[in-house]
């Protein structure tokens, strides 16, 4: 595809990444209003938690969900022009994106059909996540190259651990945890997608450094051959996410839904696995980790003591209950997410 165009610029990863990003963003701006209107006509409105903040019931009623459809449409169309499709890492990530998006889409659809926030049976939901994560991690394990099962630790120059076949359950844990943590964080206008943009931006830098032999040697990080196409994929995802944020910013005209949040979380988890940045990813996605821990702590403590640690979980609702406005919570969480990203990127050199 790139040869017959005869443009040398198309050989450069930075050029293709930049235009994949811009293209996906512009597609979102162009098709966003149409997709939002179609979702409204189909009455695919966000179903709100009855035990959530009371003001959400009036402010967010009637907003269409399944916004992940907009993101992934823009990403896939953009990638058609800018990526080498037959790259094994891209194909694995594409499988993760489509499979988890389908799972989230089913969950969203059932919520709308039943008119409650229960959606897909939790057992079926986790079974689906286990199945899709198992398939994708096994694919990575067998096609991922010599470093695939090795775990690298930030801050340490030579500390690493070869998990062998145990890398498969470990990788599944990363994917499922990332998917669910991004899903839990998607509770306020612009919150999850804004934090996702920060994580995606940092992963673009890591992917580019990891794809280059010279940078990998200089920084003492693994060089993953073939991962340069992930830079372009992440660029398209970044552009699509910025475009979605255009319509998801407060007051939101569209919600991401499980269609978007489950899939984006899983995709970024898989990218972290491919780039050998699993532990770094936990720092990078620090806000998502804290949000998930707040839910776990709330549930465990309440079951044992019948007392609540937080006024409401996940953590972003706790701050709403303390009197913070929605925009204050979102922007402050974005700032914290950016600090986590800077911290994570700084560890690349500190080895």
From Swiss-Prot:
Entry-linked InterPro entries: Glycosyl_transferase_4, PNAcMuramoyl-5peptid_Trfase, PNAcMuramoyl-5peptid_Trfase_CS
Keywords: Cell cycle, Cell division, Cell inner membrane, Cell membrane, Cell shape, Cell wall biogenesis/degradation, Magnesium, Membrane, Metal-binding, Peptidoglycan synthesis, Transferase, Transmembrane, Transmembrane helix
Enzyme class: transferase
Coiled coil: none
Catalytically driven reaction(s): UDP-N-acetyl-alpha-D-muramoyl-L-alanyl-gamma-D-glutamyl-meso-2,6-diaminopimeloyl-D-alanyl-D-alanine + di-trans,octa-cis-undecaprenyl phosphate = di-trans,octa-cis-undecaprenyl diphospho-N-acetyl-alpha-D-muramoyl-L-alanyl-D-glutamyl-meso-2,6-diaminopimeloyl-D-alanyl-D-alanine + UMP
Subcellular location: Cell inner membrane
Membrane disposition: Multi-pass membrane protein
Domain of life, per lineage: Bacteria
GO biological process: cell division; cell wall organization; peptidoglycan biosynthetic process; regulation of cell shape
Molecular function terms from GO: metal ion binding; phospho-N-acetylmuramoyl-pentapeptide-transferase activity; UDP-N-acetylmuramoyl-L-alanyl-D-glutamyl-meso-2,6-diaminopimelyl-D-alanyl-D-alanine:undecaprenyl-phosphate transferase activity
Pfam families per record: Glycos_transf_4
Cofactor(s) demanded: Mg(2+)
GO cellular component: plasma membrane
Membrane-spanning parts: 17-37, 61-83, 88-105, 130-150, 158-178, 190-210, 230-250, 254-274, 279-299, 328-348
Principal subcellular localisation of the protein: membrane
Cysteine-cysteine disulfides: none
Pathway: Cell wall biogenesis; peptidoglycan biosynthesis
EC number: 2.7.8.13
PANTHER family: PHOSPHO-N-ACETYLMURAMOYL-PENTAPEPTIDE-TRANSFERASE, PHOSPHO-N-ACETYLMURAMOYL-PENTAPEPTIDE-TRANSFERASE HOMOLOG
HAMAP family: MraY (MF_00038)
Task performed by this protein: Catalyzes the initial step of the lipid cycle reactions in the biosynthesis of the cell wall peptidoglycan: transfers peptidoglycan precursor phospho-MurNAc-pentapeptide from UDP-MurNAc-pentapeptide onto the lipid carrier undecaprenyl phosphate, yielding undecaprenyl-pyrophosphoryl-MurNAc-pentapeptide, known as lipid I.
Family under the similarity heading: Belongs to the glycosyltransferase 4 family. MraY subfamily.
Name of the protein in question: Phospho-N-acetylmuramoyl-pentapeptide-transferase
């Amino acid at each position: 595809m790139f040869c017959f165009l005869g443009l040398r610029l198309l050989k450069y990863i930075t050029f293709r990444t930049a235009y994949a990003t811009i293209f996906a963003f512009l597609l979102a701006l162009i098709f966003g209003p149409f997709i939002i209107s179609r979702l409204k006509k189909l009455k695919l409105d966000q179903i709100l938690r009855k035990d959530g903040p009371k003001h959400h019931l009036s402010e967010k009623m009637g907003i269409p969900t399944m916004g992940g459809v907009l993101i992934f449409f823009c990403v896939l169309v953009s990638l058609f022009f800018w990526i080498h499709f037959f790259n094994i890492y891209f194909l694995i990530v594409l499988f993760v994106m489509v499979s988890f998006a389908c799972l989230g889409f089913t969950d969203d659809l059932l919520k709308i059909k039943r008119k409650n926030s229960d959606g897909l049976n939790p057992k079926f939901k986790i079974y689906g996540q286990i199945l899709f994560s198992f398939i994708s991690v096994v694919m990575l394990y067998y096609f991922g190259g010599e470093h695939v099962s090795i775990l690298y630790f930030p801050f340490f120059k030579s500390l690493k651990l070869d998990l062998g076949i145990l890398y498969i359950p470990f990788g599944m844990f990363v994917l499922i945890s990332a998917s669910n943590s991004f899903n839990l964080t998607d509770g306020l206008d612009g919150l999850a997608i804004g934090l996702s943009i920060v994580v995606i931006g940092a992963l673009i830098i890591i992917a580019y450094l990891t794809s280059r032999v010279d940078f990998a040697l200089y920084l003492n990080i693994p060089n993953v051959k073939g991962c340069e196409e992930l830079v372009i994929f992440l660029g398209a995802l970044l552009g699509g996410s910025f475009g979605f944020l255009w319509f998801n910013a407060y007051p939101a005209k569209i919600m991401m839904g499980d269609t978007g949040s489950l899939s984006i979380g899983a995709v970024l988890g898989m990218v972290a696995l491919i780039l050998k940045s699993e532990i770094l990813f936990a720092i990078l996605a620090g806000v998502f980790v804290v949000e998930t821990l707040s839910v776990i702590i709330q549930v465990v403590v309440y079951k044992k003591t019948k007392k609540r640690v937080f006024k409401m979980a996940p953590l972003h609702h706790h701050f709403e209950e303390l009197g913070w406005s929605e925009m204050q919570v979102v922007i402050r969480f974005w700032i914290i997410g950016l600090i986590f990203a800077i911290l994570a990127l700084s560890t690349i050199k500190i080895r």
